[in-house]
Regions:
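A short, N-terminal amphipathic alpha-helix
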Residues: 1-3, 23, 161-165
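Conserved phosphate-binding/catalytic region of the ribokinase-like
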Residues: 152-233
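Acidic, amphipathic alpha-helical patches
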Residues: 69, 129, 199
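Phosphate- and divalent-cation-binding pockets in alpha/beta enzyme and binding domains
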Residues: 16, 41, 118, 148-149, ...
């Protein structure tokens, strides 16, 4: 079972989103419902690659604050954070507050999915990412994310190891057609290949990958903080 926690508008689009979530068996009991407008997102595809435009000023999802956060029920065991929700305040600081509040009880997975064009305050964003990295149990990045996080000539796996340093976290690197790599908490490097595929578009590809990781760990009874810390190659 999956629940969503976000700011949700009472407008037409918010009602449509809520119905779609319900039809997809995604719970909405933790959503913070308000009268602000729904964020609008537009996608343009070029050779299967997506570029995005968002209209998000004063939106229902962006304007939530830490005081809006609901208490989570004991059946919530894992929290997933990522994307542009971590870029702009007040929502970005609200999600950080949630992660820090729940890290002792819940597995935290983070996919920063860094989009430089949406970052309005780079220094604050880097500080926020460092704080949420510190409480995350699973961190998934792309090579583009790593290049932004750790600029310089070092090879990509060295940068992934640098990001893992001092953390008992599983680090996952997606490599497109070359599959994925992971550094386990003990430093073991695991590589997984993927079969060739014809790319139609990449919208939702990262989210689907992350859902697969969490579903696999859940099905193997490994989606707990203790089990993740003991993962071995």
């Amino acid at each position: 079972p999956v629940e969503m926690l976000t700011g949700m508008s009472q407008d037409l689009f918010g009602a449509q989103l809520t119905r779609t979530l319900t039809d997809s068996n995604v719970g909405t009991r933790f959503n913070i419902v308000n009268t602000r407008p729904t964020t609008l997102a537009f996608v343009e595809l070029t050779d299967g690659q997506a570029s995005y435009t968002f209209y998000d000023e004063n939106s229902a999802s962006r304007m939530i604050t830490p005081t809006d956060l609901p208490a989570l029920s004991p059946d919530i065991t894992t929290l997933y954070f990522g994307g542009i929700s971590l870029c702009n305040i007040p929502a970005a600081d609200t999600y950080l507050a949630l992660a820090e509040r729940e890290t002792s009880k819940c597995v935290i997975m983070l996919d920063p999915n860094i989009r430089p064009g949406f970052i309005t305050n780079e220094a604050a964003y880097r500080t926020r990412l460092s704080a949420i990295f510190a409480v995350a149990d699973i961190i998934k990045v792309s090579d583009e994310d790593l290049e932004w996080l750790i600029p310089g000539p070092a090879d990509i796996m060295s940068k992934l190891a640098q990001l893992q340093a001092g953390r008992q976290a599983v680090m996952i690197l997606t490599c497109g057609k070359d599959g994925a790599r992971a550094l386990l908490p003990d430093g073991t490097d695991v590589a997984v290949s993927v079969p060739p595929a014809v790319v139609v578009d990449t919208v939702g590809a990262g989210d689907t990958f992350n859902a697969g990781v969490l579903a696999h760990l859940h099905s193997g009874h490994s989606l707990t903080k203790a089990a993740i810390g003991q993962l071995r190659g």
